[in-house]
């Protein structure tokens, strides 16, 4: 799917004004091998525990984007190279992590987009804590399951509806 977030913003000023199209705060870095991706969101809310991330990525992604609200923690990684490969294998087009990733070199080889706040060498806990398929707040932007995510080098957009046919 070819698009530019800049063009989507320009063509949808009324949606931006109404809040049905939102721009996530520009603090994310690209770690994946794909720089531009779009798809409906699947959401997770958790903190320093990536058990649910693996469980989600083991499912058929069907062209979706996994949005992981890790509370913005910079103390451990929620996604690494193995999970990046799993995302690619199972048809996820991208992962947005409000937190950290690790295995940056491996993630860069994955054919999936991966956006996160930073890299961190420490792995997360494995307690199974967190919830899935709930609205999350990522850097002040609300994202509900099924919202559309559009990401490229200029930013991340969240839309209540698909913007492209």
Swiss-Prot record:
Known cofactor(s): a divalent metal cation
Chain sites annotated for binding substrate: 80-83, 102
Stored CDD domains: RraA_family (cd16841)
SUPFAM superfamilies: RraA-like
One record GO biological process: regulation of RNA metabolic process
Signal peptide: none
Positions bound to a divalent metal cation: 103
Record keyword Repeat present: no
Cofactor binding comment, as recorded: Divalent metal cation.
Entry-linked InterPro entries: RraA (IPR010203), RraA/RraA-like (IPR005493), RraA/RraA-like_sf (IPR036704)
GO molecular function, one term: ribonuclease inhibitor activity
Protein EC: 4.1.3.17, 4.1.1.112
Subunit structure: Homotrimer.
Protein name per UniProt: Putative 4-hydroxy-4-methyl-2-oxoglutarate aldolase
Organism: Burkholderia thailandensis (strain ATCC 700388 / DSM 13276 / CCUG 48851 / CIP 106301 / E264)
Classification lineage: Bacteria, Pseudomonadati, Pseudomonadota, Betaproteobacteria, Burkholderiales
